[in-house]
């Protein structure tokens, strides 16, 4: 039988993600969908050219309020895949003080990548994936920090030591 020799509980907060710059979008698309960076850049450029997203070749991780958060969110409300997410963001702050998580990198010429709110219509499978990543990240940057916990247990079994770790 095992004996628990130590339990360590660590509480912490996990901040919302920062807005996408091109590199961040490429990493996420590769991780989530195995889409290579060159293809991601090409798809993002195509989405930009039909006014679905902002300029994609940016290094900025900042979304200035002047882009009109609330207006974009209202437009996204009309897209069937995002209605509930949009409502949650708008309910978050009833005083029109929407706050976004901001990254460190800034590009004076262009803000981070964001959806324009225009209806995407028919997109290819990969275009839809990239567009969804951008929209979902846009929603996520308005989130509150999540409360997380790490639990580490040390177990002793027949003279052997085992560590078990769990994140909640």
For each of these PLM feature ranges, what is it?
Residues 1-168:
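Core catalytic DNA strand-manipulation module of type IA topoisomerases
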């Amino acid at each position: 039988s095992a004996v628990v020799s130590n339990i360590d509980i660590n509480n912490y907060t996990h901040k919302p993600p920062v807005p996408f710059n091109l590199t961040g979008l490429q990493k996420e698309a590769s991780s989530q969908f195995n889409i290579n960076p060159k293809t991601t850049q090409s798809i993002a450029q195509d989405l930009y050219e039909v006014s679905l997203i902002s300029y994609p070749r940016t290094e900025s991780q900042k979304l200035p309020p002047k882009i009109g958060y609330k207006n974009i969110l209202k437009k996204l409300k009309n897209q069937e895949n995002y209605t509930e997410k949009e409502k949650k963001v708008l309910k978050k702050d009833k005083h029109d003080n929407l706050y976004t998580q901001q990254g460190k990198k800034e590009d004076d010429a262009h803000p981070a990548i964001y959806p324009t709110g225009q209806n995407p219509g028919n997109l290819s499978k990969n275009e839809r994936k990239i567009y969804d990543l951008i929209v979902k990240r846009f929603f996520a940057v308005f989130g509150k920090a999540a409360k997380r916990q790490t639990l580490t247990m040390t177990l002793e079994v027949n003279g052997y030591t085992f560590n078990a770790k769990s994140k909640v």
